[in-house]
Amino acid sequence: MPRRREVPKREILPDPKFGNVDVAKFVNVLMLSGKKSVAENIIYGAFEHIQTKSGKDPLEVFTAAIANCKPLVEVKSRRVGGANYQVPVEVRPVRRMALSMRWLREAANKRSEKSMPQRLAGELLEAAESRGGAMKKRDEVHRMAEANKAFSHFRF
């Protein structure tokens, strides 16, 4: 590993419409090929769908969905004596947020609605109620960690 100083984290500016840093991060997660305006339109469209579908505040639904999808533990492979063990480790807060957003994006992509804003709105509403594909992924990761609890003494 290089012995240079640690590179400082970049400051992410809050998004222009809601003034929320998490929404800005999610825009960056959704963005493909540097097309930020397209990603913003998808998110703002999804927020409009949430407003019309449920009548709830879209920002509250978004924060609830992200909070519900955050994993507490995950498994990492560790090689000990010629065997690979899946060792459960606690997830750092920054990674929790990143995984949560990534799983929401992937679950929304797999849905069958016609447009991406509709798919994202549906997934966010379901995740806010602890249902949906992203929640299924989080529960699967938690189950894996629970099943491999016996190897937790192989700490990193």
From Swiss-Prot:
The keyword Repeat is annotated on this UniProt entry: no
Top-level taxonomic group: Bacteria
GO molecular function terms attached to this record: rRNA binding; structural constituent of ribosome; tRNA binding
GO cellular component, one term: small ribosomal subunit
SUPFAM superfamilies per UniProt: Ribosomal protein S7
Known partners and oligomeric status: Part of the 30S ribosomal subunit. Contacts proteins S9 and S11.
Role of this protein: One of the primary rRNA binding proteins, it binds directly to 16S rRNA where it nucleates assembly of the head domain of the 30S subunit. Is located at the subunit interface close to the decoding center, probably blocks exit of the E-site tRNA.
PANTHER family listed in its UniProt record: RIBOSOMAL PROTEIN S7
HAMAP family, alphabetized: Ribosomal_uS7_B (MF_00480_B)
Family classification: Belongs to the universal ribosomal protein uS7 family.
Full protein name: Small ribosomal subunit protein uS7
Naturally occurring in which organism (per UniProt): Janthinobacterium sp. (strain Marseille)
